[in-house]
Amino acid sequence: MVKLSKEAKQRLQQLFKGGQFAIRWGFIPLVIYLGFKRGADPGMPEPTVLSLLWG
């Protein structure tokens, strides 16, 4: 097993925490963005921000 310095371990921990933060707070907005980019299925009304907020 590779021995890492204390500084390297701290940097890796910060990197993983940053990755977790990005995944937790970025997943839903990414899905919403991709849904808007693709558009509605044929025969369905176009999605709007208001329709997302009010169902």
From Swiss-Prot:
Pfam families documented for this protein: Tom7
Entry's localization field: Mitochondrion outer membrane
Annotated transmembrane regions: 21-36
Cystine bridges: none
Subunit text: Forms part of the preprotein translocase complex of the outer mitochondrial membrane (TOM complex) which consists of at least 7 different proteins (TOMM5, TOMM6, TOMM7, TOMM20, TOMM22, TOMM40 and TOMM70).
Family membership noted in the UniProt record: Belongs to the Tom7 family.
Name of the protein in question: Mitochondrial import receptor subunit TOM7 homolog
Species this protein is from: Sus scrofa (Pig)
Name of the gene: TOMM7
